[in-house]
Amino acid sequence: MKDLLKFLKQQSKTEEFEGIKIGLASPDLIRSWSFGEVKKPETINYRTFKPEREGLFCARIFGPVKDYECLCGKYKRLKHRGVICEKCGVEVTQTKVRRERMGHIDLASPVAHIWFLKSLPSRIGLMLDMTLRDIERVLYFESFVVIEPGMTSLERGQMLTEENYLDALEEYGDEFEAKMGAEAVLELLRAIELEKEIEMMREELPSINSETRRKKITKRLKLIEAFFQSGNKPEWMILKVLPVLPPDLRPLVPLDGGRFATSDLNDLYRRVINRNNRLKRLLDLAAPDIIVRNEKRMLQESVDALLDNGRRGRAITGSNKRPLKSLADMIKGKQGRFRQNLLGKRVDYSGRSVITVGPTLRLHQCGLPKKMALELFKPFIYGKLEGRGLATTIKAAKKMVEREVPEVWDVLDDVIREHPVMLNRAPTLHRLGIQAFEPVLIEGKAIQLHPLVCAAYNADFDGDQMAVHVPLTLEAQLEARSLMMSTNNILSPANGEPVITPSQDVVLGLYYTSRECVNGKGEGMAFESVAEAEKAYRTGAAELHARVKVRITETKTDEAGEKVKTRRIVDTTVGRALLSLILPKGLSFDLVNQNMGKKQISKLLNTCYRQLGLKDTVIFADQLMYTGFHFATVSGASVGINDMVIPDEKYTLVADAEAEVLEIQEQFQSGLVTAGERYNKVIDIWASANEKVSKAMMDNLSSETVINRDGEEEKQESFNSIYMMADSGARGSAAQIRQLAGMRGLMAKPDGSIIETPITANFREGLNVSQYFISTHGARKGLADTALKTANSGYLTRRLVDVAQDLVVIEEDCGTFEGLTMKPLIEGGDVVEPLRERVLGRVVAQDVFKPGTEEVLIPRNTLLDEAWCDTVEDNSIDEMIVRSVISCDTDFGVCAACYGRDLARGHIINQGEAIGVVAAQSIGEPGTQLTMRTFHIGGAASRASAENNVQVKNAGTLKLHNAKHVTNSEGKLVIVSRSSELAIIDELGREKERYKVPYGTVLEKLEDAPVAAGEIIANWDPHTHPIITEVAGSTKFVDMIEGVTMTRQTDELTGLSSIVVLDVAQRPTAGKEMRPMIRLVAADGGDLMIPGTEVPAQYFLPGNAIVNLDDNAPINVGDALARIPQESSKTRDITGGLPRVADLFEARKPKEPAILAEVSGTISFGKETKGKRRLVITPAEGGDHYEEMIPKWRNLNVFEGEKVERGEVIADGPEAAHDILRLRGIHNVANYIVNEVQDVYRLQGVKINDKHIEVIIRQMLRKCEIANAGDSEFLAGEQAEVSRVKIANRELEAQGKQPATFERELLGITKASLATESFISAASFQETTRVLTEAAVGGKSDKLRGLKENVIVGRLIPAGTGYSYHQKRAEAAVKPAAEEAPAISASEAEQNLADLLNLAGSSD
């Protein structure tokens, strides 16, 4: 028996293949696969259930129906193996060959393969250079095509209708040949000589001028080269022989009642065979042409339906009106082969049950019901029972387990000890959704889960279910214990903060313990140790919140790393002293000597992990939880209706607001304000009233007045249960309390606009009918949103995982000096994220110098940990270059140094870590917390957005960034450049705030001047755009003719007159060509030049510009010549939340994107056309000038004669990522996407490390477009993988040849996934048909480099613990293979197996 097992093991080893290739099958290849031709459409005999001969289930072709038994029953048993029965012709062998043996159908007329015909772009059409429409007309017998023109005037491939064909026949007789149907296409394809075509097109390409024609020829050239290189022949796209799937893969099962359940494929095959046989008969009978044609067309249609039903025309339906499932449908979609069976499999040794709380468990334990454990660990139990001699055979062991003998439980305890199980909760959004625990046997039927891991699973106990999986092999147990154990997953992989932070009851309990109250029992006592304080509490001498003095002992680590004990007396409370008992040695008492809210506890755990390491943190977290639960019980905090205290001021505040609203209403009726203004003001009034009410309510709730020891009144924080819950962060928030005890406030309509009558009642008072009705809108919308959100978020995660799945850390250091420049993130002047948070856990790319010196502070390649970040802060460094995966030079992966710290472990990342998947999960997992709405900015929001000054928040020194300025007559600076920024820096040189200021800003302070907090340092007019002069002189009007190019207007209120330039459209014909401008001249009338240039100082005036000067008026530097009114920007919808993140990662172009300058140079405007203006940029160095047509309604930021830098904004709008990449480079686009994505997440309070977003961006930038091919084999304009081009260039440079140049390209994540090198990965993602068609034509081979491909072929993934296995294989492939064991063929193997089985049978 042993030999038998050994032999079976040897069999099951798969061939060690290096890759998978896909191609077109030639008719001969199909015949070589086949074991016989299927000639009849019959399936099985309905009486005997035996397969019909030569039918679709024929045993002669496909193999026997029963193991080792022929159909007629003449040969049975193993000894006749391999005999072919002379009576029924069936080979005696195993039934499983019916899963692998194929048949074939010889088609009476060739048929086009629908994939190569209809999947766009049509491969057959491209090959023949004909349109799809024409080819279809030939294939479906509507017109003829010329195959051999002979000496006639016809051309090969020309279409002829029936009439044209008959005319041509009369004219030329049989000089020429024209046919219809697939035969014609077949002959055309066969006539193509690939090599000649390639040569011709390669010669033709350089001489082509028209862009479209060049594109077309390049496409065709690529296709023909693909065919030529892969060895596929074009005529194989037309089928002459159709393969038939093995019958066990399209089963037919008899149901009771004489009916059959069958796979749709059988119906489709029957159709094909029927039509094929009929066509053969018709051809034998020499039937009339029209009948044969019709039959051929029907055959073509039936083969189309078999291969891909519904791609052409209506889908063929079965008896119950549903479309039949064709071969293509079998592999694509969520239910197809790839996603259903290859990527998602069901698992043995698993169970699921409801979860309940296990508050007494340790962090690494879970409670497993005995029943479940018994079932899951059965094989182990059987083995143990047999091993202990309690059962003689496996059967006996089985009986014992079924009877549940007492011994079984002892064995079960033994088996379970130290054997981790894995718990999983669906949906598994990130890797913390599966963790390993040690099982503890419990009574009952529910799994017990440790409360602290709920946050990671996102689990609650309202009926959630979880699945249990058992790792079987020793290796699997080892991995589960060392990598997946819940105690090893304390930090979140998304942001590196603890994920096992207490919540809810625990927080409430700890908060209650650490609160203090005035004049509590035992106040003022002093204790000589914590133990004494505890004793006082236990005996009731002092209560938990009493303010007392306690002497505590702390263990601290000094500079030398020695542990030193210190003792001191602190003012604290009894409760906090009790907390110090569970505080691990080495942490300071100050950490718990405060009100312990959720944030404080989280910080405490984080500090503990960073200072004391994993083990202490785990023990401490458990202790915190037990303590929290205990004191939450003791506190007796509960919610009663009287806890919701309504403030007395509420009613007066509401009455005041109502009065104000009435007043506005009257103003509106007397026509003083517009309807829009009234609406906005009313909303404002109610919003502020709501704020006031909630403030009054919170003041009321949060403090109470008590009598202290001296008999005086003293305010203390309230012990109101609802307030405590909200304040500690256990449950609820100020906004929710406001609805309970304040007023509900303004509600939104279903379309998102705000209803102007608010709900003034709260839940304690109760709502009346109309208020309740208004409330239902929001509630329903919320639920509908949630449902949509979940699906959308899941789909985003799927796309992200797919694009990043093959990114793995594969080397230690790529040695690049490149990196991203990190600065503190500043929004609206505030520092949102300081530099230390952005660079923590990164590697420095270039030496960082001490500010103002040449001394190296941080050497290159240092991993910045907490200590280094303190150094950065102390030396007030405000920017540094750190390594990033975006600039990593590793091919097909990244290096550890460019990635930096593994966030979930806290050290530099290991090789083989699948950072792509981690990044995708970290971004996708919080997706469900993001909103789905698009915000309309209307009313209140848009009014606030028109800023007109900068008010500083911190005192410091003023600095200007890329700003040009002139000094006006008052000595103030006027900014004359775009995209200038002001920064405020403190005395250490750290940047505190930063503001963008527009052109024409007047600064109140000079550069490097000190500013005070709250000072206004810059002003500008938000509604008009000035034109500032840079020289002093007097004005001279050119082409300014009243009534032709301008008009004079007088303001009624002020009596001042101003000149308004007319828009081109409004001018009379005489003024159409004129260009009104103001020239500045010196006193003698000579032209003035702009300082430092040879350009005369003249300013062109665009339409609608307002000039407040007269001709020949004197003017100073920095004065405004003219003002251009800005239309208030239309209220744009701001896409927020999930859709915004998806847009960024899909790199979608916004509707009206900002227009950026393509080159650096000087702006001028050319001749205008209808509705558009022509913008011309002339580069300073000479060279071609660049022109662009811009619609008139776009607000331009530039005037004639102004200089712009490449990539500067010319017309406002949302910027398109593609433009940023093209004009400002890869680092800018990376920063843009990272910051925009982070903005969305930050708004929801979700923290994600920038690294993860950068990983996805790296994958979006994988491809490039070849600009100049050099000596490489790429084509210009071709899309190629960057690493491929880099490798090819290295080889070319080594040979001293010309390398290819390329432009990086930004692809959206869906596009990038579909464009990966691996066709298996792309096909299992989306658009399966298109991907496989393209791969087959190019004869692509998949090197199985990514994770997905390896999962699909059933290997270990090349990441994590499977990384070394793949490394070894790669090394083995490089070394010549050692002497292999003699290969054994399948037939020999079966022979050996049979002999062994016979031996085994006889020895029983």
UniProtKB/Swiss-Prot annotation:
DNA-dependent RNA polymerase catalyzes the transcription of DNA into RNA using the four ribonucleoside triphosphates as substrates. Its cofactor is Mg(2+); Zn(2+). Zn(2+) 2 binds at residues 814, 888, 895, 898. Binds 1 Mg(2+) ion per subunit. This is DNA-directed RNA polymerase subunit beta'. The keyword ATP-binding does not apply. CDD domains: RNAP_beta'_C, RNAP_beta'_N. It holds the Pfam family RNA_pol_Rpb1_5. One of its GO terms (molecular function) is DNA-directed RNA polymerase activity. GO terms for biological process: DNA-templated transcription. SMART domains: RPOLA_N (SM00663). Its EC number is 2.7.7.6. Belongs to the RNA polymerase beta' chain family. Zn(2+) 1 binds at residues 70, 72, 85, 88. Mg(2+) binds at residues 460, 462, 464. It catalyses: RNA(n) + a ribonucleoside 5'-triphosphate = RNA(n+1) + diphosphate. It is an enzyme of class 2 (transferase). The RNAP catalytic core consists of 2 alpha, 1 beta, 1 beta' and 1 omega subunit. When a sigma factor is associated with the core the holoenzyme is formed, which can initiate transcription. InterPro entries: DNA-dir_RpoC_beta_prime, DNA-dir_RpoC_beta_prime_bact, RNA_pol_asu, RNA_pol_N, RNA_pol_Rpb1_1, RNA_pol_Rpb1_3, RNA_pol_Rpb1_3_sf, RNA_pol_Rpb1_4. Keywords: DNA-directed RNA polymerase, Magnesium, Metal-binding, Nucleotidyltransferase, Transcription, Transferase, Zinc. GO terms for cellular component: DNA-directed RNA polymerase complex.
